[in-house]
Amino acid sequence: MKWVNHEIVTGVIVYGATGDFLATAFSMAGAIFPDKVEGKPGANYWSWRARHRGWSHWPVLYIAILAIMQLGLLPQGADVERGATFICIGALLHIAEDAFCGKVPLFLPWQKVGIKLFTVGSVMEYLFAMAVVILTYIIHAQVMVK
């Protein structure tokens, strides 16, 4: 997915689930982290492309960070822990979103899985993002009514 759609989809999901602007901001930072650490394609596009969606898109990495934090390395409720938690959540949502437009690592960093519902940058990608936003709004509205 394009970064703008990662930001929108992740931000809407987290805000819909938490109603918290700070958690949303941290998750939106996490939503671009897996791509940001891989750098830009540059002149060696195919070399970059071969490495894209590698270790930085491995969900086990972010789940392990969350688990380590639960062991008490950071004080419970600390702002740093909260920020790191939502950055990891944003990265995990990024990986899930990428699984709809290609393949991402799952249990092993070199074993990729996913479905290709759309091509990155296509109209279908933007329609998918819009559908997630609308679905999140409907779910949020239903929960708020009860």
Regions found by a protein language model. Name each.
Residues 1-146:
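N-terminal membrane-targeting hydrophobic helices
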